Each structure stands twice: as C-alpha cells, then as structure tokens.
From Swiss-Prot:
This is Ribonuclease HII. It is found in: Cytoplasm. PROSITE patterns: RNASE_H_2. Manganese or magnesium. Binds 1 divalent metal ion per monomer in the absence of substrate. May bind a second metal ion after substrate binding. One of its GO terms (biological process) is DNA replication, removal of RNA primer. Belongs to the RNase HII family. Keywords: Cytoplasm, Endonuclease, Hydrolase, Manganese, Metal-binding, Nuclease. Residues 32-223 form the RNase H type-2 domain. It comes from Bartonella quintana (strain Toulouse) (Rochalimaea quintana). Its EC number is 3.1.26.4. It catalyses: Endonucleolytic cleavage to 5'-phosphomonoester. Pfam families: RNase_HII. Its cofactor is Mn(2+); Mg(2+).
Amino acid sequence: MSHRFDNLPDLFNLPLKPNFSCELDLQKQGFFHIAGVDEVGRGPLAGPVVTAAVILDKDHVPDGLNDSKKLSAQRRNELYCEILQSALAVSIASLCARTIDQSDIRKATLEAMRRCVTGLAIPAHYALIDGRDIPFQLPCPATALIKGDQHSVSIAAASIIAKVTRDRMMKCAGQIYKNYGLEKHVGYATLAHRIALDKYGPVVGLHRYSFAPLKGRFRDNMS
C-alpha cells in the first residue's frame, strides 16, 4: 500500500537538520501515528541488516535528532535512550546473514522493514520510509523518501535506534569471534576485516557469502 502526500520535501534543498514538517503535513490529512522507518547494515560483509520503526510523540521530540551517521557514538547512545523513553512506540527487526544470502539484501531489508512496522505496539496510520522502495504488505499507507533521515525526525530517530542496536549486536559477536575485530568495524569491509577473512576464512551464519569479496571464494556448507 502506498500513498503520496501533497507537499513532498524538496530533495535538492535539504534542511540543515531533519524536522517534523513531513509529519505535520500528514497529520493535517488525518494521519496521526506516523512511523519513521530506516535500516542499518545493507553493505557490511558480516552480520544482520537491522531496521527500526519509531512513532514519536510530537510534544516530546528529543533535541538533536539527526541522521545517525552524522552523530558521535556517544550522542547516538544518549539519543537512543531518550527515544526509547519518549516515543509512543518503537519496533526493531533484523534478518541474519544467511537469510540475506538466500534472498538478496534489497528483499531482506524491505522484509525487515515490513516486520518492524507490523510489530509496532501502536499501529501506524502512515509510514515514512527512508530510501526509494516501499515494502510490500505494509499495514498502513507509506511514502519512500530519499535521504529521509535528513528530512524527517521520525526517520532520523529510527536510524539511531537501528544503528545503535546493530552496533551492539556486532560488538557482542566480536566477543565470540575474536579474530575479526568486529567490535571496531561492525562487519564492514575494512582492510583489517578483509585481512582477517584471508587468514581465517568466513564464519558460517555470520558472514555474507553472497557478497564480494566472499562470493565465489568461499562456500556456506550448511546452506
């Protein structure tokens, strides 16, 4: 289900920081519980893709919400706690490396987005999705916004929740798989990570065998 509202943001005139204008436009049209949806982890060689959906309370929006990539780790963690305390609803979903390999990263990301919107404790009346694509079978109408985390505070909040959640998951994985430095690069294709892969090979269930440079070099024998 998709929907386009009248006053889409100007993608060539990004605000200095995300704001609540998209949400206010939708509320004027009768959509009150608006979920911002974002993902983290499309590109890494290891770990899950994580998505989050956040419905903010318009009267209690945390100060300083921004694209998670523009915030320090400390500030992300602070805002993570503030969002969980003040938001009307927060939902998180993830899909593992093996599921990504069996499908593809785009399909896995959209499915995780669908799951997190569906999993909100308060049903969303509308969803603002970061990116170009709208997941199939959402329980509400939706609009995809390119660079949405730079337009919408709801999407920015979702990006922070997803980023902090995934980083923590990868740091935990780093305590188990100590040879890969996961707590530092959280699965991305850094030089240190690629060197570790050359030396130790990938971990079944952790690494994405369908991604270069693993594809064609290694085989998931449990698939």
